[in-house]
Curated annotation (Swiss-Prot):
The keyword Lipid biosynthesis applies. This is Inositol-3-phosphate synthase. It catalyses: D-glucose 6-phosphate = 1D-myo-inositol 3-phosphate. The lineage of its organism: Eukaryota, Viridiplantae, Streptophyta, Embryophyta, Tracheophyta. It comes from Triticum aestivum. InterPro entries: Myo-inos-1-P_Synthase, Myo-inos-1-P_Synthase_GAPDH, NAD(P)-bd_dom_sf. Its EC number is 5.5.1.4.
Length: 510
């Protein structure tokens, strides 16, 4: 059975006019290596920690500024939100299609809340806590091309023509602000698009971004703003002592106009200085050590890296299944070809390397979890190939071969072909990232014994379900397995309303 909404009744949960308070017993384990009777033993000790959660239920008017607004992702997302808000339908060769938010975790997935008369009861994911309605989001952003969003939508060749015709009047007046352009960080083939750029030194560029954000907030009367990078993949920046290794050195390098400070890092600096959440949707190392330190010092949310939308999402499920089933993956070969601007930019070796790194590390935690299958340091052979084929456009082809060792020396091979409509998969992920980033800024908590409530760590691991290479605080384990990432996110939000984590034991029926 599916219900649209619910309210929790519990002595541990209190609803006030503007807040939800919950008291939550977090049950976990502590592993110690102890000397007992002259022999060291591993001992697992269950423990319970009491947490207080406090969630502000006042939903703000949200503005979202996209870096690369005129690209395939930005134009597709903007078009999709307008189509949903206006209730647009359009004819395809198969049927009359209604606008929807399929592919969005927050808008189109469900959670189990319990059972009723022996039947499982499910509710929308978004019913857990008050979230911004995507129809109410105000979009804006920057681009190195001055093309309006209607023309950008046509150039992208993602949406059906009938839909594009209906959306054009809503989008032709939407023109991105000039963006930061540095040809050293992206492929040379992007130069032909760069007709709307912010001139000046890096300090002047940061100041301009800050000015743009302030004016956007004022003009649109938004309460909160989230900025997300969906522009070109950049090459990796060199991390150098004295340049970008500390907060002070990074800010000084901006003042000195150091060439190795990337455009994405400049946008992120501007956001952090303004206390505006910044999310990196591409694989480059935007978050150099100095920037992470700056975000922590300002308690400003940062998240990334790289949207997890197609091939990598499948990989984070399949490898988790194989290793969890006691099957040993020994070779993973991933091939992609695509024809959109992302593919053209990735045809340059230095930008491809950024993508290769984010795609290749996705299985590390799953391999490390099973010392029966893998010796220390052992790892499957893992190769990632991306080629640019203009004809296929946004319809990316992903082909994977997984070779594994099975019982008694046997071999198992799984071959998968996945046609990933790149921007149609990425757009709802962008939506989830900005909505969850905003929501997380309204949640505070404290452990038993702590005096004051505090927000989540500025490095937002809560967003990891949506990213290929999750950014985590120093000393925090990186989790890539998709099921674990979703469980983490759902269970944290459940804790905010006093619900136990979903453990699937269903003991009442055993």
């Amino acid at each position: 059975m599916f219900i649209e909404s619910f309210k929790v009744e519990s002595p541990n949960v209190k609803y006030t006019e503007n807040e939800i308070h919950s008291v939550y017993d977090y049950e976990t384990t502590e592993v110690v290596h102890e000397n007992r009777n002259g022999t060291y033993q591993w001992v697992v000790k269950p423990k319970t920690v009491k947490y207080d959660f406090k969630t502000d239920t006042r939903v703000p008017k949200l503005g979202v500024m996209l870096v690369g607004w005129g690209g395939n992702n930005g134009s597709t997302l903007t078009a999709g939100v307008i189509a949903n808000k206006e209730g647009i339908s359009w004819a395809t060769k198969d049927k009359v299609q209604q606008a929807n938010y399929f592919g969005s975790l927050t808008q189109a997935s469900s959670i189990r809340v319990g059972s009723y008369n022996g039947e499982e009861i499910y509710a929308p994911f978004k019913s857990l806590l008050p979230m911004v309605n995507p129809d109410d989001v105000v979009f804006g952003g920057w681009d190195i091309s001055d093309m309006n969003l209607a023309d950008a939508m046509a150039r992208a060749r993602v949406l059906d023509i009938d839909l594009q015709k209906q959306l054009r009047p809503y989008m032709e007046h939407m023109v991105p602000l000039p963006g930061i352009y540095d040809p050293d960080f992206i492929a040379a083939n992007q130069g032909s698009r760069a007709n709307s750029v912010i001139k000046g030194t890096k300090k002047e560029q940061v100041d301009q971004i800050i000015k743009d954000m302030r004016e956007f907030k004022e003009k649109n009367k938004v309460d909160k703003l989230v900025v997300l990078w969906t522009a070109n993949t950049e090459r990796y920046s060199d991390v150098v002592v004295g340049l970008n290794d500390t907060m002070e050195n990074l800010l000084a390098s901006v003042e000195k106009n150091e060439s190795e400070i990337s455009p994405s890092t400049l946008y992120a600096i501007a956001c952090v200085l303004e206390g505006i959440p910044f999310i990196n949707g591409s694989p480059q190392n935007t978050f150099v050590p100095g920037l992470i330190e700056l975000a922590i010092s300002k308690n400003c949310l940062i998240g990334g890296d790289d949207f997890k939308s197609g091939q990598t999402k499948m990989k984070s499920v399949l490898v988790d299944f194989l290793v969890g089933a006691g099957i040993k993956p020994t070779s993973i070969v991933s091939y992609n070809h695509l024809g959109n601007n992302d593919g053209m930019n990735l045809s340059a070796p230095q930008t491809f390397r950024s993508k290769e790194i984010s795609k290749s590390n996705v299985v590390d935690d799953m391999v490390a979890s099973n010392g029966i299958l893998f010796e220390p340091g052992e790892h499957p052979d893992h190769v990632v190939v991306i080629k640019y084929v203009p004809y296929v456009g946004d319809s990316k082809r992903a082909m994977d071969e997984y070779t594994s060792e099975i019982f008694m020396g046997g071999k198992n091979t799984i071959v998968m072909h996945n046609t990933c409509e790149d921007s149609l998969l990425a757009a709802p992920i962008i939506l989830d990232l900005v909505l969850l980033a905003e929501l997380s800024t309204r949640i505070q908590f404290k452990a038993e014994g702590e005096g004051k409530f505090h927000s989540f760590h500025p490095v937002a691991t809560i967003l990891s379900y949506l990213t290929k290479a999750p950014l985590v605080p120093a000393g925090t384990p990186v989790v890539n397995a998709l099921s674990k990432q979703r469980a983490m996110l759902e269970n944290i939000l459940r804790a905010c309303v006093g619900l136990a984590p979903e453990n699937n034991m269903i003991l009442e029926y055993k």
